[in-house]
Amino acid sequence: MGLSYGIFICFLLLGGMELCCPQTIWPTETYYPLTSRPPVMVDCLESQLVVTVSKDLFGTGKLIRPADLTLGPENCEPLVSMDTDDVVRFEVGLHECGSRVQVTDNALVYSTFLIHSPRPAGNLSILRTNRAEVPIECHYPRHSNVSSQAILPTWVPFRTTMLFEEKLVFSLRLMEEDWGSEKQSPTFQLGDIAHLQAEVHTGSHMPLRLFVDHCVATLTPDRNAFLHHKIVDFHGCLVDGLYNSSSAFKAPRPRPETLQFTVDVFHFAKDSRNTIYITCHLKVTPADRVPDQLNKACSFIKSTKRWYPVEGSADICRCCNKGSCGLPGRSRRLSHLERGWRKSVSHTRNRRHVTEEAEITVGPLIFLGKASDHGIEGSTSPHTSVMLGLGLATVVSLTLATIVLVLAKRHRTASHPVICPASVSQ
């Protein structure tokens, strides 16, 4: 009553509540301005990918730990950050951390993903945040300069050289079984066949013929990894077909600038991972040039135990058995068209870029149902153990019942009187 009366008198004398009540009487909530900044920001640079992640990833006020964040299939770790920083940063090359590259009609697309996989802190067994996966893509136009800087007169970016000077764009893609479209899922079952299509987009360039010089399968995008398997070797010999597989080049070609081949999928027995990468070295020659030992596409046919080329004389494949293919002392005359092409290539080499060849990686190819998939094993092993236990118990019960019946019959035969089963057990 006294407080209300005092406020009423103050209002009459001073004419305002704000002069009478400098302190807020009723409790109020504090409102913070909403921010438009996304929790994950991506900068697609010329040769680098920069990912910036807010520690308040879920917008709940609970900060995540940088150690719970990784990038890509190879689980790349973020840069070291201070505890006072409110963001976590990744800076990686476009081809690092297992990123995947795809060639579309209008762009090169590099794709990867950000993983938040929380772990309990200290000795706790609880989590306060969820696992999250954020897909990331960088699109680079194929018909423009992707450099973020101005082009210097003394330096031509690789993409500019490839698209505007030589007009060559190489690609290696996984295809569906009918070769009609690109395979949407990279998953396989062991025993499946992978359909791969190598191609060069020539633009306004002279007609060219594409070859797969060599291919190698590895567990990571690094083609020089210690654990590897050669698929194509010796300048175009599909050596994987020598083993227990049907791997082969497809003949005839759909076009000179396209080469298709199949590979029986496999996994490395000495490693538990269920993914592989295939890296192929592609090259081109003028379309009118006759294939030779250095430029060929040869498959091994088991029914005849011989090598056969997609085009050209069968003699060019004989070196595949020797494991050494080359043309020592080659001195044949070049055609006028080839001399002009070589001159253009020489000019490109002087600018530090050789665009008649390229090394392309496709992957990862993921194998489902592999024996090392512990999640599958964990779900089936208990069931199998229970079934075995029940089966064993059944066998033991039947055996005991048989023994009891035999003993009862012998006892009846010896004593003649009819004895009820209850007396037998006594």
UniProtKB/Swiss-Prot annotation:
Residues 23-385 are extracellular. It comes from the Eukaryota. Proteolytically cleaved before the transmembrane segment to yield the secreted ectodomain incorporated in the zona pellucida. N-glycosylated. Glycans are attached at residues 123, 145, 154, 160-161, 244. Residues 43-305 form the ZP domain. Residues 407-426 are cytoplasmic. One of its GO terms (molecular function) is acrosin binding. Coiled coil: none annotated. Expressed in oocytes. GO terms for biological process: binding of sperm to zona pellucida; blastocyst formation; egg coat formation; humoral immune response mediated by circulating immunoglobulin; negative regulation of DNA-templated transcription; oocyte development; positive regulation of acrosomal vesicle exocytosis; positive regulation of acrosome reaction. The chain crosses the membrane at residues 386-406. Keywords: Cell membrane, Cleavage on pair of basic residues, Disulfide bond, Extracellular matrix, Fertilization, Glycoprotein, Membrane, Pyrrolidone carboxylic acid, Receptor, Secreted, Signal, Transmembrane, Transmembrane helix. GO terms for cellular component: collagen-containing extracellular matrix; egg coat; extracellular matrix; extracellular space; plasma membrane. Residues 1-22 form the signal peptide. It is a single-pass type I membrane protein. It is found in: Cell membrane. SMART domains: ZP. Belongs to the ZP domain family. ZPC subfamily. Component of the zona pellucida, an extracellular matrix surrounding oocytes which mediates sperm binding, induction of the acrosome reaction and prevents post-fertilization polyspermy. The zona pellucida is composed of 3 to 4 glycoproteins, ZP1, ZP2, ZP3, and ZP4. ZP3 is essential for sperm binding and zona matrix formation. Polymers of ZP2 and ZP3 organized into long filaments cross-linked by ZP1 homodimers. Interacts with ZP1 and ZP2. The ZP domain is involved in the polymerization of the ZP proteins to form the zona pellucida. This is Zona pellucida sperm-binding protein 3. It comes from Canis lupus familiaris (Dog). The lineage of its organism: Eukaryota, Metazoa, Chordata, Craniata, Vertebrata.
